[in-house]
Design a protein with these regions (language model features):
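Hydrophobic side chains in well-ordered alpha-helices of soluble proteins
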Residues: 1-2, 56
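Structured catalytic cores of enzymes that bind and process phosphorylated ligands/cofactors
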Residues: 2-3, 31-33, 188
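A conserved beta-strand/loop element that lines the FAD pocket in flavoprotein oxidoreductases
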Residues: 6-20
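Short, well-ordered alpha-helix to beta-strand connector turns
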Residues: 10, 41-42, 171-172
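Mid-domain catalytic core of redox enzymes
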Residues: 18-152
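Polybasic (Lys/Arg-rich)
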Residues: 161-163
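Short FAD-binding loop at a beta-strand-to-alpha-helix junction that anchors the flavin cofactor
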Residues: 165-184, 189-194
Length: 195
């Protein structure tokens, strides 16, 4: 439905098109897809992680580059599962987000479980959880998926960089958006895209 609406509005939507580099000039922006030629556009909207944006921005100025480099990422190991043993023993203590810390943990990253049923209003008879960075055992029969996410680290440098990049939005036909431009939530990505 969205693709049809964009097509009706004259939008040339290109999905799964890897971009090699972006350069800006007095007449707008040129984007070069992998294996393609440069194509001209009025503006560019970077809706990618800041490190990917930096890699794509072939002619970034020092202010843009310093701000984009200031936002660091950390890997978080994700397990999508249905193992209720990972949650507190008392069901009354279950919450949308459950933080656990083992005195003997071997990592500097937090062990956090999202209760997907509560967050997505799913029926509770089929428990679904996303657990990050756990060193606890999860029943392998109840693991549905595993992957590594790269989440932004919101330190002082990152917060300053967010402000710099927000102030730069629109300059040089360039726009920056994404969850990393606020608090890291999907809704933040949408909000910064709309802004």
């Amino acid at each position: 439905r969205v693709e049809r609406a964009l097509s009706t509005a004259g939008v040339d939507l290109r999905v799964s098109t890897a971009v090699e580099t972006v350069r800006r000039g007095t007449l707008g922006v040129e984007v070069k897809a992998v294996g393609g030629e440069y194509e001209a556009f009025d503006d560019v909207i970077f809706a990618t992680h800041s490190d990917i944006t930096l890699a794509l921005l072939g002619d970034g100025n020092s202010i843009e580059c310093e701000a984009l480099e200031a936002i660091k990422y950390q890997p978080n190991e994700m397990i999508l599962h249905g193992d209720t043993s990972i949650m507190p023993k008392r069901k009354a203590a279950w919450a949308s987000w459950v933080y656990t810390e083992d005195k003997e943990r071997q990592s500097d990253r937090i062990d956090l479980t999202y209760w997907i049923n509560r967050l997505q209003s799913l029926p509770n008879d089929d428990p679904c959880f996303v657990t990050l960075n756990t060193q606890r055992d999860i029943d392998p029969a109840l693991i549905y998926d595993q992957c590594t996410f790269h989440h932004p680290v919101f330190d002082v440098a990152a917060l300053k960089a967010q402000k710099v990049l927000t102030d730069l939005n629109g300059a040089n036909s360039t726009w920056f958006c994404g969850a990393w431009m606020r608090n890291g939530f999907h809704e933040d990505g949408l909000a910064t895209g709309i802004e």
